[in-house]
Amino acid sequence: MRIQRTLSNKKGALALAVLVAALAGCGGGDGAETPQAQANPQFPNSPATGTPESPTTPVTPGKPTSLVAPSCLNCGAVDSSTYAGTGVGVWQATNATSAAADVPVSIDGLTGQDVTLVFTNESGVAQPMPAISLTASRFPSVAASQLRWQDPATDAKQRIGEFNRNGWAALAGSQGTGPRYSMSSGPSKSVVNDTRDWFNEDNSVRSTTLVRQATTTDGVTVNFWVENSENGPTKVSSAIIDQLADRFASAGKVYDMLKDVGGPLWGSHNYSNLISGTGQPIDIVILNFDHNNAPYGMTGYFYARNAIAKSASNPYSNESLSLYLDSETLYLDGATGLTEVVMTMAHEGTHAQNFYRRGVLGGVQYMFATWLEEATAMMMEDFASATLDPGHNPIRDVRFYDYVKYKGGSYNCSLLDWTPFSASCDSYSVSGSFGGFLNRQLGLRLYKSLLGNMSSTNSVDVLDTVIKTNFPGTSFVGQFRRFSATAGALIPAATSPNGFGFPARSDNGYNIPAIDPTAYAPYRTLTQTVPTTLQAYASLPVVRQAVKGRYTETVKVPAGTTLAVVIH
């Protein structure tokens, strides 16, 4: 489901036995959510160029030893120990050993640029983080003044998410050998002004009225139901409903984009206890979720229990293909709230679509892990945003903003460990920001392939396979390294080397805007304490400010971790 926060202001000692300059993809861990390790693979700087992601560069004789290698082409990294003096330079080295290792770094040619050390753990398990000196943020007072959070309740979203991922299978009934093997009767026809009671996710009963019907370009009926106490000119007005109907059902809008990218939201199946696979309308049910007189929090949800027939073991089913939206968000924050709910329809529609495509048709074992499930929903928002509201992009305006500032930044937060709005991490911002990076670097081709790929029941392996298949020479680890370097060093959009950054992209009519990480510098709060561990598939930036001449430091890098040195 989609959660939206309220923001106060949006806008060793051990020698290097194995240290590969040509970056090694470190697998490892217990095998859970970890791609297969490879021996010294080469990754290209860009899927289109076929050039090595981190070419081997010999150390220049007479210069201090520097065991990092340039990781960008036509950029500020001249060789392993020289910066061009302008632009962005990226150097990398991977510690493929099982213990922390010293990496000497010596780079000449700086004229006052910042040096950012970005540690990216690619091992699949948390690694002990060695001691390192830290630098205070340049903007602590600005960032601290804006750290006012409204933490949404997590129980509901966790319960719904877990049910959608695997809880539904025990209630779906027996499977036949062909489609439409369902004991559930087909849907009844509704007309405007019909009344109906709906179960909210908390099992409370809400009385509603059907206030509007729309028809999609392929003939699917879309019903808009509004809770009676929320229906009216000062709350959920007819003008608001008109806008929701237009942006969901009109040609080229949410429904058409969802179907174009990922296929139908519902259809034939062979489960006996699921609702009929034919003739289903889409019900959009607008309820006051929590009666807290405030917008946001949980702005919407898709709950798979409603696609299962009502029974003694599933007594709160609405027996409907339905999306649920928060009414207070629609009318308590004007156009901004309306935009968030419109994006929520794209987000929750993706969850519904994933449930049908991957769960019902593929099998419960192919449902994405939560981190990737939510990432795909936020990636769809990203692709849809320019069509729905050209002035708003959820990755640029919300997710990446939160990534760099949420309670000291969500850097050392595992991509795989779903902890939204926790004491130190916001998983929505982590998955959303990485998804936004993949959208801009690899595009719609990757996204479409990801949605339908069932080559593994391990979500990391699925993403890794899709990247390698569509863009030979790169990988999940390679892309995560580049994302980490981009986000950790706030690489400027104007001078991002090929393969780094968040560039604008257009794919078959889907347009996504560029994101300039440097614009977020005033809001970033760097960690002031070295963490005990570097989490699995997480990164940590450490900044050396305004360096002139030669930057020299021996950096202790955790096991299974890549060190990126970024200068700009």
Residue ranges and their predicted role:
Residues 51-52, 308-317, 394-425, 485-488, ...:
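Surface-exposed intrinsically disordered loops and tails
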Residues 55-98, 106-108, 457-568:
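Beta/coil-rich, acidic/histidine-enriched accessory regions frequently appended to metallopeptidases
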Residues 93, 119-122, 134-236:
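Acidic/polar low-complexity interaction segments
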Residues 220-369, 376, 387-388:
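Juxtacatalytic substrate-recognition/specificity segment
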